[in-house]
Amino acid sequence: MGAKQSGPAANGRTRAYSGSDLPSGTGSGGGGADGARAARFAAPVSGAQQPSASAGAAAAAAAAASAPAAPRSRSLGGAVGSASGGRAAQSAFSIPSAGGGGGPYGSQDSVHSSPEDSVGARDRDRPAGGGPGGPRLVIGSLPAHLSPHLFGGFKCPVCSKFVPSDEMDLHLVMCLTKPRITYNEDVLSKDTGECAICLEELQQGDTIARLPCLCIYHKGCIDEWFEVNRSCPEHPSD
């Protein structure tokens, strides 16, 4: 058999899949056109990229400027936190003022106040009544003859007078050394009231005793009275 001849279909397929079949002139001309087209489109593309490049530079500058601001903000935050912590500690350890003065440690008046001022303030705040905080009654504020029982006085066994304790010795000496009252014995000539000692009627014919103060009693009653007392029953101060 003879050599196989290539048909037009085979040649067309070969040209379709092989780029070397293109003429060199056509290929060089196409390459030049493609290069010119690429250069024409490259310029607008590079010009369009210029704004993005400037924007990137601005972003980089902003990032560089903001980089030191973060530590500064942190340092400022720490300073603010330390200041607030100091104020909180000061308020926690502050001494309250008794008078409610302005400031954590009270006013200067409360610091420099004297003990006399404190006593005067307590006296002003004390109620005027006689309660626990009011003025108390002092024994010496009343005369002895108005309130002798406050002094722990006693009743004299001689004259039956209530005597203050500080005058007890002098009064006993005077009463014991005082001479007995003398009386005039008499017989009652008529009925005259009642005896102040026995509270019985003084009748005509009764033996009576007439004292210097002109008081009359039954003789027996006044004798018993003088055994204990040295004064008239109706005039103990004489």
UniProtKB/Swiss-Prot annotation:
Transcription among keywords: no
CDD domains associated with the record: mRING-CH-C4HC2H_ZNRF2
SMART domains reported in the protein's UniProt record: RING
Catalytic activity entry: S-ubiquitinyl-[E2 ubiquitin-conjugating enzyme]-L-cysteine + [acceptor protein]-L-lysine = [E2 ubiquitin-conjugating enzyme]-L-cysteine + N(6)-ubiquitinyl-[acceptor protein]-L-lysine
GO molecular function terms listed in the Swiss-Prot or TrEMBL record: ubiquitin protein ligase activity; zinc ion binding
Lipidation (N-myristoyl glycine): G2
InterPro entries named in the record: Znf_RING (IPR001841), Znf_RING/FYVE/PHD (IPR013083), ZNRF_ubiq-protein_ligase (IPR051878)
GO cellular component: cell projection; cytoplasm; cytoplasmic vesicle membrane; endosome membrane; fibrillar center; lysosomal membrane; nucleoplasm; plasma membrane
Coiled-coil annotated spans: none
Membrane association type: Peripheral membrane protein
Sites of Phosphoserine modification: S20, S24, S75, S82, S107, S110, S141, S147, S189
Biological processes per GO annotation: positive regulation of autophagosome-lysosome fusion; protein ubiquitination
Gene3D superfamilies associated with the record: Classic Zinc Finger, Zinc/RING finger domain, C3HC4 (zinc finger)
Domain comment as written in the entry: The RING-type zinc finger domain is required for E3 ligase activity.
Record function comment: E3 ubiquitin-protein ligase that plays a role in the establishment and maintenance of neuronal transmission and plasticity. Ubiquitinates the Na(+)/K(+) ATPase alpha-1 subunit/ATP1A1 and thereby influences its endocytosis and/or degradation. Also acts as a positive regulator of mTORC1 activation by amino acids, which functions upstream of the V-ATPase and of Rag-GTPases. In turn, phosphorylation by mTOR leads to its inhibition via targeting to the cytosol allowing a self-regulating feedback mechanism.
Quaternary structure, from the entry: Interacts with UBE2N. Interacts with ZNRF1. Interacts (when phosphorylated) with YWHAE.
PANTHER family: E3 UBIQUITIN-PROTEIN LIGASE ZNRF1-LIKE PROTEIN (PTHR46661), E3 UBIQUITIN-PROTEIN LIGASE ZNRF2 (PTHR46661:SF3)
Full protein name: E3 ubiquitin-protein ligase ZNRF2
Gene: Znrf2
